[in-house]
């Protein structure tokens, strides 16, 4: 769960910074990144109250480490009662059967999609590398957990190897 936090956290930051809307972020991560669900779609499925509680618990468990801090956006969603599919409203709106209502069209600018993927992957890879460095699990176990446990399209450390550590460090340095 700790390694997966940036999937939500960095996506929310991209939204809060005004770089892209939620539909575009979800679209980029699904179509370019190969993820089965976008982060906002997934938070709505899990329940924004549940996701916020898990995020807060991880933050508290790591002694309020800033990188795990819950966002104000998450908090406001919970306070508003916009918990996702179960309430018919979350980051997206849903009909009475829990199906997504018609939403806006995502931006299809390829450079924006790549920018989103690079940021989210860099943060995910950084978290996986930190877990590896601290001896939490082996490289193989981390990648197995992310592909089989969280259903990511690739293991994060295998993904990191495709472009190399220097590439991902460069992405992190400009964030």
Question: Language-model segments: what does each one mean?
Answer:
Residues 1-175:
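N-terminal glycine-rich phosphate-binding loop for ADP-containing cofactors
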């Amino acid at each position: 769960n700790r390694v997966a936090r940036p999937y939500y956290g960095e996506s929310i930051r991209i939204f809060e910074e005004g770089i892209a809307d939620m539909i575009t972020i979800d679209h980029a991560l699904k179509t370019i990144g190969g993820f089965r669900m976008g982060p906002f779609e997934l938070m709505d499925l899990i329940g924004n109250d549940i996701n916020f509680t898990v995020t807060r618990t991880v933050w508290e468990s790591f002694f309020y480490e800033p990188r795990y801090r819950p966002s104000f956006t998450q908090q406001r969603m919970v306070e508003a009662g916009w918990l996702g599919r179960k309430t018919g409203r979350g980051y997206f709106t849903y009909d009475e059967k829990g199906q997504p209502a018609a939403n806006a069209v995502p931006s299809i600018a390829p450079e924006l999609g790549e920018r989103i993927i690079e940021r989210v992957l860099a943060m995910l890879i950084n978290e996986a590398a930190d877990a590896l460095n601290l001896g939490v699990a082996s490289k193989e176990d981390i990648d197995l957990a992310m592909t089989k446990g969280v259903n990511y399209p690739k293991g994060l450390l295998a993904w990191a190897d495709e472009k190399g550590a220097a590439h991902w460090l460069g992405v992190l340095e400009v964030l």
